[in-house]
Amino acid sequence: MDHFVEFEDVCKYYQTGSVKIAAADHMNFYVDKGEFCIIVGPSGAGKTTLLNILGGMDSCDEGHVWLDGRDVSRFSEKALTTYRRYDVGFVFQFYNLVQNLTALENVELAAQICRDPLDAAEVLGQVGLSDRLSNFPSQLSGGEQQRVSIARALAKNPKLLLCDEPTGALDYKTGKQVLALLQRTCRETGRTVIVITHNTALTAMADRIIQVKSGQILSNQVNEHPVPVEQIEW
């Protein structure tokens, strides 16, 4: 197993009445350590199923899922809980912040359950919120709240950062700022970042582009010349 992340013939089925649907249909792909990867495809393509399996929030019915040399698909429920807690940071479309905690307290809350967390205030500073530590979510803009959620994920010091449509609830300008932050985080820390999106324009900023359709991997390509998100229009 030479790759940092690898799906090996992964299948996930759902039963709808008498119909069996393959949300993941023999998926094969890999991502190398430190890459900024974008997984792109239309709604219903299987992107979120893929993310849920890779993030340990769901299990596959067939195949193997590897992260850093370990077969996640063979983990027990207890091992999966440990995996989600320590190894993976999650950023979703909606921020899911605790409303009666400050920005700093939201990040500290996540850091407290981890083995080797980063300093919460320092990480908030890295995402441009050093002057907003004491603000509650209701006092922050959408972009600032998403930055808190990114800081919360990074403070766990995870091996892998998974982002599911992280700009979906943001306006164009703010969305670009958040994507720039994710790209910079990958470059500066060497952390592996995977972003799931339906927006094909964003693939220009990725080191690796994985296309998904109808539960299958259409392509897995390296982008030799990724560009800053500031240069991308959509």
List each language-model region with its residue ranges:
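ABC family nucleotide-binding domain
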Residues: 3-205, 209-212
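Conserved beta-strand-loop-alpha-helix hinge in the C-terminal portion
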Residues: 216-234
